[in-house]
UniProtKB/Swiss-Prot annotation:
Subunit-level organization: Monomer.
Binding positions ([4Fe-4S] cluster 2): 157, 161, 164
Cofactor(s) listed in the protein's UniProt record: [4Fe-4S] cluster
Organism: Baumannia cicadellinicola subsp. Homalodisca coagulata
Catalytic activity: N(6)-dimethylallyladenosine(37) in tRNA + (sulfur carrier)-SH + AH2 + 2 S-adenosyl-L-methionine = 2-methylsulfanyl-N(6)-dimethylallyladenosine(37) in tRNA + (sulfur carrier)-H + 5'-deoxyadenosine + L-methionine + A + S-adenosyl-L-homocysteine + 2 H(+)
Name of the featured protein: tRNA-2-methylthio-N(6)-dimethylallyladenosine synthase
Annotated MTTase N-terminal domain residues: 3-120
GO terms of molecular function: 4 iron, 4 sulfur cluster binding; metal ion binding; N6-isopentenyladenosine methylthiotransferase activity
Length: 451
């Protein structure tokens, strides 16, 4: 009998990556087949995120729906993983005693043994420890699911920003050995992956050991990945300004495989707020990085993260943030109203900003960046862009879909044989979240820089 696994994932790309690894692992060890239908599953897993507000409520709301399935099928196994699991631990079972497995981001590789334990003993198991990079040693060979692939290079974060829960839920920074990463990417390249997206809470903190001794920096790793045959594009998420080195900027100058798009979170344009956030850099230092990036890659486009309504944020602080947004001309952002995360220093700060004011500031910020992004998109109309065709369009299966170097989704008419290939497409229309293109007949030129 084929056993079925249903997994629901909240949060960042790292969580998406972890979930894909869980699927591959359990397929390998228990022959589980993935299903989108919770009602037909033998095991239900919830991979959680604690970054945003009401993460716990979201978790227990979902568990409440699954509880009904457990009553129908007592042999159903329910597991909770990810950052909320790491943060809450046994508290989850105190509120939901029907949960069988609780595992953290660093112990997902132990799921096969946890499942066996529950099956044999019918008793719950909790493992939210931090065994460094052990989980990567236990994972099966990566299975490509298209022409793009995520690869985790570093886990955790040591920066301890005052608002952030990541160091407490994913642990301190631990870099994977350089050769392990290169082996994984070579395996993916052999499966016709053309674009690699390197992942970490702070990728530019990467300091991986080499088998022959010594340390590999993030800049060096990028150069090594670019040298792998078949890998034509490299992206990465997320970076921190305090470790965005000149050596890393030089990689943008020398390495065409590294795309002309970077996500560099700043959170605020006020030095006073940045100090309260314990970000470790000033606005001027951030702008210096951007200036250097533009100098070596004039076509580069920048996205960022912003928190509005941080405790103590005044109108002047917010005005400085808006000034930075206009000056840098960000292409997009992930922006949110501040919400206190349990256990973080900022959770104890006095919050003087009303909720209505926070909402108004968020609207102003997002509207400004939306207009800037639309200007970038409009400027691309009539240009020829090099698209990596990722698959069929989500809205129209008769159309193909792919991304430009500057991370724009483009939908166009083509044949399925183009999936996994780079094609040149003329941009003929612009929408709020995508572009429409037309395949051009001359496909000789492999890359066309984004506008």
């Amino acid at each position: 009998m084929n056993l079925k696994l249903h997994i629901k994932t909240y949060g960042c790309q790292m969580n998406q990556y972890d979930s894909s690894k869980i699927v591959d692992l359990l397929k390998n060890t228990h022959k589980y087949q993935l299903t989108d239908i919770a009602e037909e599953a033998d095991i239900l897993l919830l991979n959680t995120c604690s970054i945003r507000e009401k993460a716990q409520e979201k978790l227990f709301h979902q568990l409440g729906r699954w509880r009904r399935l457990k009553k129908i099928n007592p042999n159903l196994i329910i597991g909770v993983g990810g950052c909320v699991a790491s943060q809450e631990g046994s508290n989850i079972r105190e509120r939901a005693n029907y949960v069988d497995i609780i595992f953290g981001p660093q112990t997902l590789h132990r799921l096969p043994e946890m499942i066996n334990h529950v099956r044999i003993t019918r008793s719950p198991v909790i493992d939210i420890s931090f065994p460094e990079i052990e989980k990567f040693d236990c994972m099966p060979k990566p299975q490509a699911k298209g022409p793009t692939a995520f690869v985790s290079i570093i886990e955790g974060c040591d920066k301890y920003c005052s608002y952030c829960v990541v160091p407490y839920t994913r642990g301190i920074e631990v870099s994977r050995p350089c050769e392990d990463i290169l082996l994984e990417i070579n395996n993916l390249a052999d499966q016709n992956v053309r674009e690699i997206h390197l992942l970490g809470q702070n990728v530019n903190a990467y300091r991986g050991t080499r088998y022959g001794g010594g340390t590999c920096t993030f800049a060096e790793l990028l150069r090594l990945v670019a040298a792998i045959n078949g890998i034509d594009r490299i992206r990465f998420t997320t970076s921190h300004p305090i470790e965005f080195t000149d050596d890393l900027i030089d990689v943008y100058r020398d390495t065409p495989e590294l795309v002309s798009f970077v996500h560099l979170p700043v959170q605020s344009g006020s030095d006073r707020i940045l100090a309260l956030m314990k970000r470790g850099h000033t606005v001027l230092e951030y702008k210096s990085i951007i200036r250097k990036l533009y100098a070596v890659r004039p076509s580069i486009q920048i996205s960022s993260d912003f928190i509005v309504g941080f405790p103590g944020e005044t109108e002047e602080d917010f005005r400085q943030t808006m000034n930075l947004i206009s000056e840098v001309n960000f292409d997009m952002s992930f922006s949110f109203i501040y919400s206190p995360r349990p256990g973080t220093p900022a959770a104890n700060m006095v919050d003087i900003v009303s909720q209505d004011e926070k909402k108004q500031r968020l609207y102003i910020l997002q509207e400004c960046i939306r207009k800037q992004a639309m200007k970038f998109s409009q400027a691309m109309k009539g240009t020829v862009q090099c698209i990596l065709v990722e698959g069929t369009s989500r809205k129209n299966i008769m159309h193909l879909s792919g991304r430009t170097e500057n991370n724009r989704v483009v939908n166009f008419i083509g044949n399925n044989g183009m999936i996994g290939q780079f094609v040149n497409v003329e941009i003929i229309d612009v929408y709020s979240n995508s572009l429409r293109g037309e395949l051009i007949s001359n496909q000789e030129k492999k890359y066309t820089l984004s506008a």
